[in-house]
Amino acid sequence: MRKSILVTIVMILSSCQMNTSDDFLVIGHRGAMGYVTENTIASVEKAIDLGVSMVEIDVFRIRSGEVVVFHDDRVDDLTNGAGEIEDLYMPDVLALTLQGGHKIPKLQDVLKAVNGRISLNIELKGANTAAKVNQIIEYYSLHQGWSLDQFVISSFRWDELEKMRELNPEVAIAVLTEKDPLDAIPMAEKLGAIAINPWYKNLTQEAVDAIHEKGFKVYTYTVNEAEDIAQMKAMGVDGIFCNYPDRAL
C-alpha cells in the first residue's frame, strides 16, 4: 500500500514538472536545417510544412546596409565565395550560391515568404543590427499584416539587445547565453525580456526552476536527439530550438 502511494506521488510530481505538447514550443532552428540548407526560404518553408509555430533565423547587417539572413561570420563554409559577410555589398551577396543551390535572402524576403503564417525569432548575429531590424519589423507590423507580438529578438550580443529595447519598448526579447544560465537573469530583468535561451548542456533543473521563479521562459538550444528532447521536457523547459522540428512535435 505504502509503495503504491509513493509511486502515485512520483507520477503526480512528474506530470506537474513536465511540459505537455500543448505548451511546449518547438522552434525550427534556422528553419529546418537538418533537412534543408540553413537560413534559406526553403528551410523556413520546410519547418512550416513540418508544423512549427515559430522559426529562428540569424541576421547580419552587411556593408551596404541591408539585413541578410545568414549565421556564420564568414561565407566560406556555406557558399562558393569567401570573406566576412559584414564586409560584403548586396551585389556580392546576390552573386553567392549556398549549398543546395539556394541564395542568401534578405530579412524582408523571409518576411514576405512567411507572410505572418508563423512567429519569427530573429537572432542578431552581427554588430549594429538592432536599429535596422527594428525598422523592418515595425514596418511589417504596421503595413504588411504582421503583428509585433509575432517577433522575438534574441542575441548573444547583449549590447544589441539593449539597443533594441531602447528603440522598441514593446517587442519581445530573449537573452541568449552559452555560459551559466543564471548569469543571464540580471540582463533579462534589465531588458524586460520574456525568456532566457541557454545551451541545453549547461542547463540544470535548479537553473530551470530559478529562471522560472524570476518569471522568464526557458527556450534551450539546440536539441535534436530524442533522449535529450525528452529530458528537456521532463525538466520543464518551455521549448527547444531543433534542427529536425518534427522529432519534437
Regions found by a protein language model. Give the residues of each.
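Sec-dependent N-terminal signal peptides
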Residues: 4-13
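Phosphate-group recognition and catalysis centered on beta-loop-alpha active-site segments
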Residues: 14-249
